[in-house]
Amino acid sequence: FELPELKLLVDAVQASRFITESKSRSLIKKLESLVSVHDARQLQRQVLIAGRVKTMNESIYYNIDKLHTAIGEGKQIRFQYFQWTVEKKEALRRDGGWYCVSPWHLRWDDENYYLIAYDAEADRVKHYRVDKMKRITLLEAPRLGQEKMARSDLAVYTQQLFGMYG
């Protein structure tokens, strides 16, 4: 890497809302190890982002990794899903019941990762915010929904879905 490239990566890590403060420091230290001590000092900088709060959810990195694995291996997953209460506490949806879906894509939009998956029970494509998913487990069952995914225009789906947030 050239130093300007590493500076750009450091800035992106610091600015990213889904990366916790501790994980940001850890990643930046790893980037610093790629250059001399003198150049590493230039990477020790703070990017000021207005109105930005970093996540406290350390498990998101492992969730993303599990989801990529499930997508790559063509496996179904199960997980619990939560929402935030007005008291800013996690409340599991479906009274803590499990969601079982076939993951097809991960989408990064407006500082959040979303899973786009086929829900066989509902027979439709759905999306889930990855930072609200808990206890993700890969199942041995093969992924379903190939025909439904092939028939759906993913570009139109994501534009309609994520366009309403922007």
Give the role of each language-model region.
Residues 2-88:
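Bulky hydrophobic/aromatic content
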Residues 37-42, 61-65, 93-96, 132-139:
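A broad, low-specificity signal for short, low-complexity segments enriched in glycine/proline
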Residues 48-52, 86-89, 100, 107-108, ...:
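N-terminal start-of-chain detector that recognizes signal peptides
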Residues 66-67, 103, 159-163:
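Generic recognition of flexible, low-complexity loop/linker segments
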Residues 68-121, 126:
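Loop-centered beta-sheet repeat module
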Residues 114-166:
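Surface-exposed, charged, gly/pro-rich loop-and-adjacent secondary-structure segments at domain edges
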